[in-house]
Amino acid sequence: MAYFISFEGIEGCGKTTQLKLAAQYLRTLKIPVGTTEEPGGTPLGKKIRNILLNRGPFEICAEAETLLFVAARAQHVREVILPSLARGQWILCDRFSDATAVYQGCVRGIDEAWIRQLDSFATSFLKPNLTLLFDLPAETGLHRAMQRMTGIPENSREDRFEQEGLNFHEKIREGYLALARQESERFRIINAAADIPSIHREVCRHLDVLRQQPEAGLP
């Protein structure tokens, strides 16, 4: 049985590091696993990622931003995620639909019902079997994100969201926690302020629970 798992959280929460460690863990168990990210994961998605995350000479309105994220996701689902699951390969995805619901819905103010409808069309109603939410104070995450950018040439930085103020990131955190309360069966909240090995052990516990479940289809 192949499972689809998304890794979510504010900037600097460490989800990307934990995704890589989780993939390594599953491979030690001889479980076929692929890793991917949003926006990205496909040639089209990478071009859209470059537009969305790199600072440029133009502004992107919230509506255009939303449509670009969802367009990248539509291609990603059909080109990468669904074919991989059909082959029996687990997929670990760095952000998925919840990120759009939070960043563009809760924070940018785009109508959340419209986002859900648009996203359902783009994904053919696909949802992760499990979503790991890496939670920590927004100030801590933003500090980590800024440290991560140190030494990276300015024209190579994917930092458009990191450049937002603390209030923006606090709203992102609140939005994620609200989603986790609404869909508590799918979400698992992980204390991302802990050290990397401790967080990894908790991630592995959740993966072990998932792989011991009786076979079932995707939500």
From Swiss-Prot:
<dbReference type="InterPro" id="IPR027417">
    <property type="entry name" value="P-loop_NTPase"/>
</dbReference>
<keyword id="KW-0067">ATP-binding</keyword>
<keyword id="KW-0545">Nucleotide biosynthesis</keyword>
<keyword id="KW-0808">Transferase</keyword>
<protein>
    <recommendedName>
        <fullName>Thymidylate kinase</fullName>
        <ecNumber>2.7.4.9</ecNumber>
    </recommendedName>
</protein>
<comment type="similarity">
    <text>Belongs to the thymidylate kinase family.</text>
</comment>
<dbReference type="GO" id="GO:0006227">
    <property type="term" value="P:dUDP biosynthetic process"/>
</dbReference>
<dbReference type="GO" id="GO:0006235">
    <property type="term" value="P:dTTP biosynthetic process"/>
</dbReference>
<keyword id="KW-0418">Kinase</keyword>
<dbReference type="Pfam" id="PF02223">
    <property type="entry name" value="Thymidylate_kin"/>
</dbReference>
<dbReference type="GO" id="GO:0004798">
    <property type="term" value="F:dTMP kinase activity"/>
</dbReference>
<dbReference type="GO" id="GO:0005829">
    <property type="term" value="C:cytosol"/>
</dbReference>
<comment type="function">
    <text>Phosphorylation of dTMP to form dTDP in both de novo and salvage pathways of dTTP synthesis.</text>
</comment>
<dbReference type="InterPro" id="IPR018094">
    <property type="entry name" value="Thymidylate_kinase"/>
</dbReference>
<keyword id="KW-0547">Nucleotide-binding</keyword>
<dbReference type="InterPro" id="IPR039430">
    <property type="entry name" value="Thymidylate_kin-like_dom"/>
</dbReference>
<dbReference type="GO" id="GO:0005524">
    <property type="term" value="F:ATP binding"/>
</dbReference>
<dbReference type="GO" id="GO:0006233">
    <property type="term" value="P:dTDP biosynthetic process"/>
</dbReference>
<feature type="binding site">
    <location>
        <begin position="9"/>
        <end position="16"/>
    </location>
    <ligand>
        <name>ATP</name>
    </ligand>
</feature>
